[in-house]
């Protein structure tokens, strides 16, 4: 994440682009056929505060960047929530079920964390990366 906004993260640019692509692609698929579909991406800079979605970050002395990607799709069904990061798991007719597992590996391989919150009003993925 770069100089355009003055916030720098420790992550490979090509890899984090793949993470964003995977999450946004899933969001677009989830909202397919819905009117007034929105995807909102927010970047926040944190110093160990307000990170309730990923509490183990609180124990770290690092400063974090939070990127949230939200959609207003139908949300992730209860019975699949624990499987979204499992390789080869998919609820779709096409695809290999690798987008979110690859995203998790990239984020965690960069020393970060990925988590999500979901309801019938939509889903938000949270990506936490160490500030450079």
Task: Show which residues each predicted segment covers.
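Acidic ATP/Mg2+-coordinating residue in the GHKL
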Residues: 71
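Conserved catalytic submotifs in the C-terminal HATPase_c
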Residues: 1-7, 46-48
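Short beta-strand/loop element within the Bergerat-fold HATPase_c
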Residues: 38-50
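Conserved micro-motifs of the catalytic ATP-binding
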Residues: 8-11, 91
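Detector for a conserved hydrophobic position within an alpha-helical segment of the HATPase_c
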Residues: 107-108
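Short conserved segment of the HATPase_c
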Residues: 62-64, 76-88
């Amino acid at each position: 994440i770069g100089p355009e906004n003055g916030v720098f993260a420790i992550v490979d640019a090509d890899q984090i682009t793949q993470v964003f692509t995977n999450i946004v692609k899933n969001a677009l698929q989830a909202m397919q056929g819905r009117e007034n579909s929105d995807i909102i991406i927010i970047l926040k800079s944190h110093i160990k505060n307000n990170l309730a979605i990923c509490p183990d970050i609180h124990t770290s002395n690092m400063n974090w960047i939070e990127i949230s990607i939200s959609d207003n799709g139908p949300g992730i069904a209860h019975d699949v929530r624990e499987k979204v990061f499992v390789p080869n798991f998919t609820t779709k007719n096409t695809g290999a079920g690798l987008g979110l597992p690859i995203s998790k590996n990239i984020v965690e391989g960069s020393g970060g964390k990925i988590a999500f919150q979901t309801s019938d009003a939509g889903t938000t993925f949270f990506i936490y990366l160490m500030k450079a």
